[in-house]
């Protein structure tokens, strides 16, 4: 039995289908921290979900079940919390996991893409040999806010010849417009829970 089969068997024994009760359990496991990192912000702390093994397992299983028959050939996770959800999803799907990182963190030849922040710009990088032409790529991250990080990630994948039509998140903040932004780029967004506000 492969590692992916063992993980799948464990998940199936623990959590079977996406129900309103399961999704509420996941949402309830995410703590809200007011006025962090600055006044007026309600910070959604996904690390509290990671501390609860049942909530963490449920979130992974629900993402896996959503994309099990989608023909995904690679899962890409964005630094850093995208790794925590993307890698187990890739393992359960039986496909490779590709990290997208900040500059200077990947050892082989890389491709980079700049993106806008609230007060400037930043860059993301991917190994040039991590995606092959025709790969069907699922992008996974913990949270969707404005969509800038995922847009840059999708551009990197597409520049390498990969196809990105789906992105998956634990949390969506719809008031910040990220889902609409990604939809205009041909990327369908799937999120387990939504929170209003910033």
Curated annotation (Swiss-Prot):
Pathway: Purine metabolism; AMP biosynthesis via salvage pathway; AMP from adenine: step 1/1. It comes from the Bacteria. It is found in: Cytoplasm. The keyword Zinc does not apply. Keywords: Cytoplasm, Glycosyltransferase, Purine salvage, Transferase. One of its GO terms (biological process) is AMP salvage. InterPro entries: Ade_phspho_trans (IPR005764), Adenine_PRTase (IPR050120), PRibTrfase_dom (IPR000836), PRTase-like (IPR029057). It is an enzyme of class 2 (transferase). SUPFAM superfamilies: PRTase-like. CDD domains: PRTases_typeI. GO terms for molecular function: adenine phosphoribosyltransferase activity. It catalyses: AMP + diphosphate = 5-phospho-alpha-D-ribose 1-diphosphate + adenine. Its EC number is 2.4.2.7. One of its GO terms (cellular component) is cytosol. NCBIfam families: apt, PRK02304.1-1, PRK02304.1-3, PRK02304.1-5. Belongs to the purine/pyrimidine phosphoribosyltransferase family. Catalyzes a salvage reaction resulting in the formation of AMP, that is energically less costly than de novo synthesis. Homodimer. This is Adenine phosphoribosyltransferase. The lineage of its organism: Bacteria, Pseudomonadati, Pseudomonadota, Gammaproteobacteria, Enterobacterales. The gene is apt.
């Amino acid at each position: 039995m492969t590692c992916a089969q063992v993980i799948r068997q464990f998940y199936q024994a623990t959590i079977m289908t996406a129900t309103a009760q399961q999704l509420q359990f996941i949402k309830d496991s995410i703590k809200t921290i007011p006025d962090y990192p600055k006044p007026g912000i309600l910070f959604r702390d996904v690390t509290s979900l990671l501390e609860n093994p049942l909530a963490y397992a449920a979130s992974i299983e629900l993402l896996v079940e959503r994309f099990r028959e989608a023909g995904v050939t690679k899962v890409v996770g964005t630094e850093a919390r995208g790794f925590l959800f993307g890698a187990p999803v890739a393992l359960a799907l039986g496909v490779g996991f590709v990290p997208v990182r900040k500059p200077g963190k990947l050892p082989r030849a890389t491709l980079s893409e700049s993106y806008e922040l609230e007060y400037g710009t930043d860059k993301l990088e991917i190994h040039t040999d991590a995606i092959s032409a025709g790969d069907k790529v699922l992008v996974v991250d913990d949270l969707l806010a404005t969509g800038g990080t995922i847009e840059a990630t999708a551009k990197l994948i597409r520049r390498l010849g990969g196809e990105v039509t789906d992105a998956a998140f634990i949390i969506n903040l719809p008031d910040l417009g990220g889902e609409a932004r990604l939809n205009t780029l041909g990327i369908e967004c799937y999120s387990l829970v939504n929170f209003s506000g910033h």
